[in-house]
């Protein structure tokens, strides 16, 4: 399961691009009439996008949905942002698991840094989908807060639910 989390961001909220939600609402989120923690398979992997400013909130979501944090990717962008304390040039993709899911086979373990250009607002690099597909081939895939559809993935967001 991959998720782009629409955290509220104080005075820097992406509200002009899409509606945002408080962390508590994301933790209690229902899709297709059921809590996310019940939608995800008993044995599942969660890939959760976040930024430095929302890292602690992302960990709350992981816990609320019944997952255990394991590792992360860093998406290093080609353009630098404004930042608060430092000028941010990356996003973080947290990896969490629940149930009987182990790490990917050694041949399917990618490097932790993804180098890819920044695209439209909130659009993640296609390389990430390909990494997830290689890491866990054969597992069903669901993207929450999706901006696009992708073959072999179920998508849910404020644009569609397929």
Task: Walk through the language-model features, giving the residues of each.
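Class I S-adenosyl-L-methionine-dependent methyltransferase catalytic core
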Residues: 1-162
């Amino acid at each position: 399961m991959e998720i782009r989390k629409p955290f509220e961001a104080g005075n820097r909220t992406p509200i002009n691009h899409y509606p945002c939600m408080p962390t508590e609402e994301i933790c209690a989120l229902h899709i297709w009439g059921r809590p996310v923690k019940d939608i995800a398979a008993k044995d599942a992997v969660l890939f959760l996008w976040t930024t430095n400013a929302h890292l602690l909130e992302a960990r709350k979501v992981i816990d609320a949905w019944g997952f255990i944090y394991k590792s992360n990717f860093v998406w290093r962008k080609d353009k630098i942002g404004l930042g608060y304390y430092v000028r941010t040039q990356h996003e973080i993709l947290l990896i969490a698991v629940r149930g009987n899911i182990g790490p990917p086979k050694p041949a399917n373990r990618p490097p932790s840094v993804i180098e890819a250009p920044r695209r439209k607002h909130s659009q993640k690099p296609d390389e990430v989908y390909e990494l997830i597909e290689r890491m866990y081939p054969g597992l069903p895939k669901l993207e929450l807060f999706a901006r696009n559809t992708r073959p072999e993935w179920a998508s849910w967001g404020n644009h569609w639910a397929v």
